[in-house]
Structure formats: C-alpha cells, structure tokens
A protein has these predicted regions:
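Subset-of-secretome marker
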Residues: 1-137
Length: 137
C-alpha cells in the first residue's frame, strides 16, 4: 500500500508499505520515495539522506538509501517486536536549509502504525490504512 505524495514545503514523499506474513504480520518493509522540488539545490538530497540514515540507525531500524533521478529512495525493515509509526518521516525544505524529523508519538492515531509485539491481522490493518488515505493493493 502507498500514500499518495504531494509537494509540501518543497518535498514530495510517498510511502509503500509491505506487510509480511500470511494472516498475522511478522515484519514490515517500507519504501519511502522523497522528491525534492526542482527549485532547490540537489545537494539537499544528500543532506536529507545523511540525516535519514542517522535517524533510523539511532532507532535500530534497518535502513538503506540511494539517490537516483533527483529522488531519494529509503528502504526500511521493521522486524523487532515493538510499536512503530510507518510514515514517521517529516521533512521540511526551505531556502534556509533542511529539517528532518522522525515522529515518535501518534497520540491522535493519525499515522500508519503497527505494533509487531501483537498479532496483527493483515485485513484489519489494510482497512485501518485505507481510512488514513493510503492506497492499498
């Protein structure tokens, strides 16, 4: 499933979420594609890449990145039995610089989240993600 991206503060971001497991989810892979508005220097992507790699390393989430065609591709694997926010990356780009933040709390249940310490039914999760405007395949 993926969330449709729109340019917001100079960045367009999409998230493709793959739920692994037949009926009960045992891990999740997320592919984030980050596209920078053409008015910004392409070096910003390198700055974002470095910040993203450090942020996910600090959270002990397996992360690989690559830059291609003016896009940053971030592949994440969530495998530990804990709670995660899957669309947790908040990036703001301006003429003054770049701000990269990882959202840690979802007090209002507005993000695509999962708790791998619980038995998650794939169909129930997909219904929940559709409500949050994700496109599910």
């Amino acid at each position: 499933m993926r969330k449709k991206g729109e340019f917001n503060s100079g960045i367009k971001q999409t998230n493709e979420i793959i739920l692994n497991g037949k009926n009960i989810i045992n891990s999740v892979d997320v592919k984030k594609t980050i596209i920078l508005d053409s008015k910004y220097d392409s070096n910003y992507l390198t700055i974002i890449e470095d910040s993203v790699k450090k942020a996910y390393k600090d959270k002990n989430i397996k992360c690989s990145t690559k830059i291609e065609d003016n896009s940053l591709i971030v592949n994440l694997s969530y495998t530990k039995k804990q709670k995660y926010i899957l669309d947790d990356l908040d990036i703001v780009v301006s003429d003054d610089g770049v701000s990269v933040n990882i959202i840690n709390d979802d007090n209002y249940n507005t993000y695509a989240g999962i708790d791998l310490s619980k038995d998650n039914n794939k169909d129930d999760l997909i219904k929940s993600y559709k409500i949050k405007k994700y496109v599910c395949k």
